[in-house]
Swiss-Prot record:
Disulfide bonds join C50-C102, C166-C242, C288-C353. It is an enzyme of class 2 (transferase). The lineage of its organism: Eukaryota, Metazoa, Spiralia, Lophotrochozoa, Platyhelminthes. This is Fibroblast growth factor receptor 1. The gene is FGFR1. CDD domains: PTKc (cd00192).
Length: 854
């Protein structure tokens, strides 16, 4: 018996020791490395961090941590608790290489981690930034970037995938490494996140894209590239840098930085009703939508135990509801939609819509209730009816008061209807302006600034357009114009006819002398019929065309904010004896004085411009015996943007697309426009709205500059003093920021026009909001190289987009550059055949300024 007691006591002692050992094992500290970087440079600040953790089941105890280098104590820290973190910092020297140890212990045990640190000398050579091969003198032992690297920027929507290529020329004998970094554009790659590091085994040769540049590099060099697949996040802007370096630092490093712009207006989101209540037995459509292109959407019916507060969403117990399709269920490109027929109570619950590609989800609470005829009355509180009744009473009372006000206003205004007779005055401040518009002076067309173009030292000033009222009359008697406005539409029509007949009796013939002016009228009727304005326009014998020889058809060519353009037929106009088709501009019924002012100014500027094969030609005016009409030559193929878009698969609606635009054809179009702008510059004209939509395509496919609604005649520059709707994506920085316009600001717009031509009608800065364009331009962002543009054409675009206007070419220089490019392009000579097949492409076009910016 005593022996059994002894065995039990020994067993209890042994179990106590085992429990003590297991507790010590459970409660000894564990260490974790936070930093794993082992290779450092001198002068860098080394940061080593280790973290100690004790099991939460243990009591808090004293933790001690010590740092050693090669067994020499560096520092220590003591804390009471279950966690401890300690960071060791030091600015490095070469002798700081060695074995660093983090040692931690408590009464239950200890742990340690080791860092084997290698410190090397800081780089003492320069990192070349954007060192692009440009044809200048080269050195043998240098890395050069491919010339087309300077053309690569990206503007995308969130979650777009981009494939970037870092292309470069390298000596054959060098082993290279290419590192890709992502960082803020306000900082450099030193503090960036390393995305990938390519060794020599992942760097490929790129012979095809480098073939034309092999003559510019040393014989012992090779063309290589490294690529990165990058998915853009929802950040507005980030930069990606590729760093090229040799393994042994035998040559200078080279790097290039890509800018990635993400349109914040396209942040991904889901639309899923947060709650819905439906009646038992009815049909219900559950729909989830997103703005993400080509999405994968799921709709789940959530398990009742689902906890929305849990940061990790588990759907294992939920039902994938979107698979329960019947014949009426459907899934479109950007939505998941399910029609549930004959709803019952089993459908009540919570539903979750999620996007497979992104961590986005929305939850709907669906309630199925039993409905009856008196359900609404029984379920809605009386207070709701009282609130609704109160608001209905307020609305009815407001309507009654408003009706009384209108009745009173009409009674007062009925005594105030009157007619206003106005005259349009064109004042010529410059003594030479009339000789300009009469074509009696000779001008140079190969220079730009107006000071060298004027026939004498006097500045060329545009005419001043004034509109002044002549009489305000309340009676219509004894030949005076004015009558109380009748209240019925029939009376209004009769009054209008009476005014026309009365005014016909006051027609003055347009004299033939330069100083002979007679006035006629134009009729404006306001939209409210409360007054009429009678406009009298100056008559110019040189441009006046008999109204009876002009026939206007019903074919509308375009319509703007205050004007319309119709096709017409003119007899004996200009030097043509046969009837020809023309375009006729006219005012709409509801125009204002400001519209008349702008219309007449555009008409006067077209007189001043004169004739050039690449500028739309003014043929005549009808200012007498009827409404104002402006006659210009007809461009049967519409505007250039629609013309080139007909060959672009993204825009063309034609089932049959004949032929393709060659580089030679597109360069020829660009050359014609440059010649037209050279001529306008010689006439002291700044266009201010040069774009593909304002270039018309003539009968023989000649380019014609048109739409002079924003055009001004200037002496060196014109400063806009007022704000208005402007084509900001085509405007130069100084025009946007300083409202300063010169011929060089037209050169900037010409560069954008070139980009439109060679992209076959794409919109510039397509993913960027107009208000953000200015800031991006100031940061150096440019439209990417079009696929159809060669290296020389894109260089010309970039030259036109120089931030400093002094660094841009003038139009005469652009003409010379394009002639040189066309002579070197080896295209098949089938341009005329191709054009003859395009007759089916005659498109309607707007001859006026568009209603909104594209």
């Amino acid at each position: 018996m005593s022996g059994l007691f002894f065995l039990l006591s020994e067993l209890l002692i042994l179990l106590g020791k085992i429990n003590s050992v297991s507790k010590k094992s459970l409660c000894h500290p564990e260490l974790f490395k936070i930093d794993n970087k082992l290779n450092w440079r001198t002068s860098e600040e080394m940061v080593l961090t280790c973290k100690a953790v004790v099991n939460e089941k243990c009591k808090k105890s004293k933790l001690q941590m010590r740092w050693y280098k090669d067994n020499e104590l560096l520092g220590k820290k003591i804390e009471r608790g279950l966690k401890m973190k300690y960071r060791y910092r030091k600015k490095l020297k070469l002798n700081d290489s060695g074995n660093y140890t983090c040692f931690v212990f408590n009464k239950n045990g200890n742990s340690s981690v080791f860092f084997l640190i290698n410190v090397t000398e800081k780089e003492n050579f320069h990192v070349n930034e954007n060192k692009i091969l440009d044809g200048s003198e080269i050195s043998n032992n240098t890395l050069y970037l491919h010339p087309e690297m300077g053309m690569e920027n990206y503007h995308v929507i969130p979650n777009d995938e981009i494939v970037m290529q870092c292309r470069f020329f390298s000596p054959i004998s060098i082993n290279l490494t290419v590192s890709w970094y992502q960082h803020s554009c306000d900082s450099n790659y030193h503090n960036a996140q390393l995305l990938v590091k390519d060794s020599k085994f992942n760097i490929s040769s790129n012979k095809e894209s480098c073939q034309s540049y092999l003559s510019h590099i040393p014989l012992d060099s090779i063309c290589l590239y490294s690529w990165l697949r990058f998915i853009a996040t929802s950040d507005d802007q980030s930069c990606i840098t590729c760093l090229i370096e040799s393994d042994n630092n035998s040559i200078e490093k080279t790097k290039f930085t890509f800018t990635v712009l993400v349109d914040a207006g396209h942040r991904p989101h889901l639309t899923f009703a947060p709650s819905s209540t439906v009646c038992q037995g009815s049909n219900f459509t559950m729909k989830c939508e997103t703005n993400v292109p080509r999405p994968i959407l799921y709709i789940y019916k959530l398990d009742p135990s689902f906890n929305i507060e849990n940061p990790i969403i588990h759907l294992s117990n939920s039902t994938l509801f979107v698979n329960n399709y019947n014949e009426d269920s459907k899934r479109s490109s950007q939505s998941a939609e399910v029609l549930i027929k004959s709803m019952d109570f089993n459908y009540s619950g919570r539903y979750l819509c999620s996007l497979a590609e992104l961590p986005l989800f929305e939850i709907m609470h669906l309630s199925v209730i039993k409905c009856s005829n008196n359900f609404f009355m029984n379920s809605v509180p009386l207070s709701i009816f009282l609130v609704i009744g109160f608001f209905v009473a307020i609305i009815l009372l407001s309507l009654i008061i408003y009706c009384f006000f209108l009745q009173y206003k009409n009674a007062v205004d009925s005594r105030k209807h009157f007619s206003i007779r106005k005259t349009v005055i064109v004042e010529y401040e410059s003594p030479i302006y009339k000789s300009f518009i009469n074509g009696t002076k000779n001008f140079k067309t190969d220079v730009l600034h107006t000071n060298s173009l004027l026939p004498d030292s006097n500045p060329l000033l545009p005419p001043i357009i004034k509109i002044k009222p002549i009489k305000r009359l309340s009676q219509f008697r004894d030949g005076n114009y004015g009558e109380q406005l009748p209240s019925t539409s029939t009376d209004r029509t009769r009054l209008e006819s009476t005014r026309h007949s009365q005014l016909e009796n006051e027609v003055f013939e347009c004299g033939s002398g330069n100083n002979s002016l007679s006035l006629k009228y134009g009729l404006r009727k306001s939209s409210s019929f409360e007054f009429f304005s009678l406009y009298e326009f100056p008559c110019d014998a040189k441009w006046e065309f008999p109204r009876e020889k002009l026939k206007i058809t019903n074919k509308k060519l375009g319509e703007g904010a205050f004007g319309m353009v119709y096709e017409g037929i003119a007899n004996d106009i200009g030097n043509r004896s046969n009837p020809i088709k023309v375009a006729v501009k006219m005012m709409r019924d509801d125009f204002s004085d400001s519209n008349v002012h702008d219309f007449v100014k555009e008409m006067e500027i077209m007189k001043h411009i004169g004739r050039h094969p690449n500028v739309i030609q003014l043929l005549g005016l009808c200012t007498q015996k009827g409404p104002l009409r402006v006659i210009v030559e007809l461009a049967p193929y519409g505007n250039l943007r629609d013309f080139v878009r007909a060959k672009n698969k993204k825009y063309s609606k034609s089932k049959k697309i004949i032929g393709n635009f060659t580089s030679s054809i597109l360069c020829t179009y660009s050359l014609q426009i440059a010649r037209g702008m050279t001529y306008l510059a010689s006439r002291s004209v700044v266009h201010r709205d040069l774009s593909a939509r304002n270039i018309l395509v003539g009968e023989h496919f000649e380019m014609k500059i048109a739409d002079f609604g924003l055009t001004r005649i200037v002496d060196y520059y014109y400063r806009k003093k007022t704000d208005g709707i402007l084509p900001v994506k085509w405007m130069a920085p100084e025009a946007l920021l300083e409202k300063k316009y010169t011929t060089k600001s037209d050169v900037w717009s010409y560069g954008i026009l070139l980009w439109e031509i060679f992209t076959l009608g794409d919109s510039p800065y397509s993913a960027i909001l107009p208000e953000k364009v200015v800031d991006l331009i100031r940061k150096g962002f440019q439209n990417p190289k079009p696929e159809l543009a060669n290296f020389e054409i894109y260089r010309l675009m970039q030259h036109c987009w120089s931030l400093s206007s002094e660094n841009r070419p003038n139009f005469f220089e652009i003409v010379e550059i394009l002639i040189d490019i066309i002579q070197r392009i080896d295209d098949e000579p089938e341009e005329n055949i191709y054009h003859s097949e395009l007759n089916y492409l005659k498109m309607e076009s707007d001859y006026l300024e568009p209603k909104c910016l594209v």
